[in-house]
Design a protein with these regions (language model features):
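The feature captures the beta-strand-to-loop junction immediately N-terminal to the Walker
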Residues: 32-34
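Short, charged/small-residue-rich alpha-helical element at the C-terminal edge
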Residues: 223-286
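Q-loop/switch helix immediately C-terminal to the Walker
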Residues: 79, 86-100
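Conserved ABC transporter NBD signature motif
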Residues: 55-69
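Helix-to-loop junction immediately C-terminal to a conserved catalytic motif
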Residues: 47
Length: 290
């Protein structure tokens, strides 16, 4: 029997479901979809903050509302608001005393020190929250979610709105947590943000998972782009018109065969290239087809 870190079974509620999913220890799964798809609500159900109308959430086999299970979950909300007058260290101390099971071996100061290292905030420990930039606020969200050695992290838009360097840094920190067995479910309205992080992707639309699978499989489709000297009167079968010319999924045929089809239609081919379909394209296609 597989020991899942997190399971949601037949979850339904207001503008949500039915949804079922399971997350393995050390797995990073990305939840993507347009605004209003239900990503945040599903994460809040998984965290035990919102009760579903039907279905069940379990954390390491325990019901999510079991106090022991709650100690295993860390949640970082989108646009999380922190008390701005506190220092980073004092804020995390407050959360440690409020939410973490402490003991002689797990003193609040030790938990805070560990969370600061995890999030890369040790140098900012004595800074006031209202002096932090966007990237450090996102790191602070990760620190409070991971505080206390949580084994399941639910991260809502933690990578959104960051420059490439800050995003890469946070992705590396999340990946290191996963390498230690922490299960991560992370949402993003920007699918490209998850392409370097998530091993599995779930596409949400109108509160339902409409497509799911390993990222490598979803991104495995090759697309032929053809640049033309003049726009076509009509594209060949299987091609669609783009700003530069045409494109089509190769879907088992060779590049040579696809280009031969273009030439058979007397199209003025200037150049061509093969690219891999992006996660953003997959999300848009899924949205348009449902």
């Amino acid at each position: 029997m597989t020991d899942y870190a997190l399971t949601l079974t037949d979850i339904s509620g207001r503008r949500l479901g039915p949804v079922s999913l399971a997350l393995l220890p050390g797995e990073i799964a990305g939840l993507v979809g347009p605004a209003g798809a239900g990503k945040t609500r599903l994460l809040r159900v998984a965290a035990g903050a919102v009760r579903p109308m039907t279905g069940e959430v379990r954390v390491w086999g325990m019901r999510v509302r079991d106090p022991t299970a709650r100690q295993l979950i860390g949640y970082a909300g989108d646009s999380q608001i922190f008390p701005r007058a506190l220092t980073v260290h004092d804020l995390l101390m407050y959360y440690a005393r409020l939410h973490c099971a402490v003991s002689r071996e797990r003193a609040p100061r030790g938990l805070v020190r560990e969370a600061l290292e995890i999030a890369g905030l040790a140098a900012a420990a004595d800074l006031r929250v209202d002096s932090l930039g966007r990237a450090d606020l996102h790191r602070l969200s990760l620190a409070q979610a991971a505080l206390g050695g949580r084994r399941v992290l639910l991260l809502d838009e933690t990578l959104s709105g960051l420059d490439a360097f800050a995003r890469r840094d946070l992705c590396g920190r999340i990946a290191r947590l996963a390498a230690e067995g922490v299960a991560v479910l992370i949402t993003s309205r920007d699918p490209a943000a998850l392409e370097r992080l998530a091993a599995r992707v779930l596409v949400l639309r109108d509160g339902r998972i409409v497509r799911a699978g390993p990222l490598a499989t979803l991104l495995g489709e090759r697309i032929l782009e053809v640049i033309l000297d003049a726009p076509p009167a009509e594209p060949p079968p299987g091609f669609r018109v783009t700003a530069a010319g045409l494109e089509a999924p190769l879907a088992g045929r060779t590049v040579e065969a696809a280009l031969a089809l273009c030439r058979a239609h007397r199209l003025p081919v200037r150049a061509s290239r093969v690219r891999v379909k992006s996660l953003e394209e997959i999300v848009l296609e899924t949205h348009d087809s449902h």
